Each structure stands twice: as C-alpha cells, then as structure tokens.
C-alpha cells in the first residue's frame, strides 16, 4: 500500500524531504505540495513526478487524496498546520520546533488527547542516526554502567543573518536537548546557560556562542557547547560517560587523504551530509508507522518537553541563574521515556 503524502514548505528542508521520499523511501508517494513561493512549489512538484500544487496549505491538508502530511514551512506556522492535521485525523511529520512556545506545543498535545491517539511526529532526526542509535544500544546494554555525564558539541559553519540569537537554543541546541532526553531516558529538571566570549565573526547584536548545563531527574549532568560561526564546517560530536566506561560519538567515516606531508579528511558544510541517513531512516519509519497508525519517533509530547527545557535555558540567559524546567504532568497517551 502506498501512502500519498502532502508536503507544506518546499524550501531547504521541504525540498530535501521531497527528494528523499521520491527516491529513497518505500511505500511513499509525494502527491501534493504547497509553498508560499508558487514558483518554488511548481519546481518541487516537478521533482516529485507530477505532484499537484496546492495554493492553500489547509486545502492540501483536507485533500481526500492526501493520506499524511510533512510540515517543513516557517517555524511560526507549525502549530496551526499540526493542529489542522490532527483535526483531519492525518499523520503529520512536523519539522522542529513543533511550535514557537511550550504553551503552543501543549495545545497540540491537548488536541491529540481529545482525538484519543498520537498523530504527530516531530522532526528530531538524531533519534534515527546510526551512531546515536548505537550509543543508546550500548548504554541500554549496561556495558558501561549507569550514565553519569553527557558531553555534546554542536557547531555550524554559519547561521542565517535574520535569526535572533535565541535561536541558538530554540533552533540549534534543542536537538541536543531532545537527544539527551532520549538517550538517557530521563527528563531534564534544571538548566543553566553560560555566555562564552563571542566570536569576531558575529554581528554586533548576535551572540554566536552558548554553553548549557542541564541536570536530569536522576542527577546526570549534560553539557552542550553551541557555536554557529565555526567557519571550518558542520561538526556534531559527543561523549557519554558511564560508571564503567564511555562512548564517544564522532563524525561518520569519510575518505582520508595524505598529500605533501599532510593527512586530512573533509568536513561537512552543513547538517545534510552528516545526517542524510538519519533523515532517510526518519522518513521511512514515519511512513511505515503511519500505515499502521503508530508514531515511532519523537511525539508531540517530546516536542513540548524539549521546548520547555529550551525556555528554561532562555530564562537562565536572561537572569544569569539556574532555572527550573516547568513541565506539565505527562498524559497516559504518550509512552514514558525508556531509561
């Protein structure tokens, strides 16, 4: 059975999702697209081999020939499109953030609760990355004992000039927040944000570095280094320290060259080469799960919980002190984190 998918937003992420769904995901067909830029939508439709172009995103959601929806539009539109999908009873893969505030995320959670079943998967693709999956497998096996600390490095080669520096946490660091919750199987209860020296590449009103220290309910400390002007490339690394050993996460294997007395390997320019397998696995899992009425990735609740932690980090930035994470009780509709 083929799932007919509509894609809202045909920019960088949306175009990549359309390409992956069309060429690398089984059981899926891109049937309809929408974008605020009609020319871009037409180009995406052509790449998807004849998908229809909808001028109205809500018309795409309500289209009887669309079984499920990918939301890859501007962040501020995610909530309304996710809510519309829930009302229509259609599975939706919503790029992060689920909504721009934790309060708005909670509205999506409440809509799912009224409907009685989860329909929303949030695009935290690291959960599907082979290296992170192996890290979790080793931790869950007990080989390194209980987790004590998690170190995370997140560096971007550059950052869109229009974004505020709060996006370092809500748009960049939120990936590290979600993966920490998922790896450790624990909620984060406090957040402390430090402001390191700003790089000379940053514009005057932009703080391009942050350092977060998060504490989980069982006392595991998580530190997250964020730097979004690392001109050499995109760099995501990490180390999980346990009682009996540690697990280090490095960039995937690439060709190493030796030439004129030097040895080196290429560094990805952005997140897409580094996480191409994760995105493909995420989309395949979403399509497979959607066909059976399940959600296998990050849920709307995970989107809400990560947003709540991000807001605590921003509160710490503003006050200079440790901030508690204020989170509502988890509804029974959602499976608890697996420690």
UniProtKB/Swiss-Prot annotation:
Q: What class of enzyme is it?
A: oxidoreductase
GO terms classed as biological process: inositol catabolic process
Q: Report the InterPro entries cross-referenced here.
A: Gfo-Idh-MocA_inositol_DH, Gfo/Idh/MocA-like_OxRdtase_C, Gfo/Idh/MocA-like_OxRdtase_N, MI/DCI_dehydrogenase, NAD(P)-bd_dom_sf
Top-rank taxon of the source lineage equals Bacteria
Q: Which reaction does it catalyse?
A: myo-inositol + NAD(+) = scyllo-inosose + NADH + H(+)
Annotated EC = 1.1.1.18
User: Keywords for this entry?
Assistant: NAD, Oxidoreductase
Keyword check for Oxidoreductase? yes
> Which Pfam families does the annotation name?
GFO_IDH_MocA, GFO_IDH_MocA_C
One Gene Ontology MF term = inositol 2-dehydrogenase (NAD+) activity
Subunit architecture: Homotetramer.
- Its job: Involved in the oxidation of myo-inositol (MI) to 2-keto-myo-inositol (2KMI or 2-inosose).
Which family does the record assign? Belongs to the Gfo/Idh/MocA family.
Q: What is this protein called?
A: Inositol 2-dehydrogenase 2
Q: Which organism is it from?
A: Saccharopolyspora erythraea (strain ATCC 11635 / DSM 40517 / JCM 4748 / NBRC 13426 / NCIMB 8594 / NRRL 2338)
Q: What is the lineage of its organism?
A: Bacteria, Bacillati, Actinomycetota, Actinomycetes, Pseudonocardiales
């Amino acid at each position: 059975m083929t799932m007919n998918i509509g894609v809202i937003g045909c920019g960088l992420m949306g175009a990549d999702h359309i390409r992956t769904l069309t060429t690398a995901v089984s059981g899926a067909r891109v049937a309809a697209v929408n974008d605020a830029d009609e020319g871009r939508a037409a180009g995406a439709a052509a790449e998807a081999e004849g998908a229809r172009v909808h001028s109205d995103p809500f018309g795409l959601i309500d289209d009887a020939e669309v079984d499920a929806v990918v939301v890859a539009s501007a962040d501020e539109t995610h909530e309304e499109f996710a809510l519309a999908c829930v009302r229509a009873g259609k599975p939706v893969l919503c790029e992060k953030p689920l909504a721009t505030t934790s309060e708005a995320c909670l509205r999506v959670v409440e809509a799912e609760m009224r409907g009685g079943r989860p329909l929303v998967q949030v695009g935290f693709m690291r959960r599907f990355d082979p290296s992170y999956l192996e890290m979790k497998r080793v931790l869950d096996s007990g080989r390194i004992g209980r987790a004590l600390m998690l170190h995370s490095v997140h560096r971007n080669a550059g950052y869109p000039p229009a974004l505020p520096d709060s996006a370092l946490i809500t748009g960049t660091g939120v990936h590290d927040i979600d993966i920490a919750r998922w790896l450790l199987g624990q909620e984060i209860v406090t957040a402390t944000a430090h402001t390191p020296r700003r790089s000379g590449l940053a514009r005057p009103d932009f703080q391009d570095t942050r350092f977060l220290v998060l504490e989980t309910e069982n006392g595991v400390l998580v530190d997250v280094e964020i730097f979004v002007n690392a001109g050499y490339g995109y760099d995501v690394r990490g180390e999980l320290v346990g009682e009996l050993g540690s697990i280090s996460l490095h960039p995937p294997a690439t060709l190493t060259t030796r030439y004129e007395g030097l040895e080196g390997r290429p560094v990805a320019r952005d997140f897409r080469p580094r996480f191409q397998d994760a995105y493909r696995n995420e989309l395949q899992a979403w399509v497979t799960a959607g066909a059976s009425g399940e959600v296998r990735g990050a849920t709307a609740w995970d989107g809400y919980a990560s947003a709540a932690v991000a807001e605590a980090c921003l509160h710490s930035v503003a006050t200079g002190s440790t901030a508690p994470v204020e989170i509502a009780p988890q509804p029974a509709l959602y499976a608890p984190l697996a420690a």
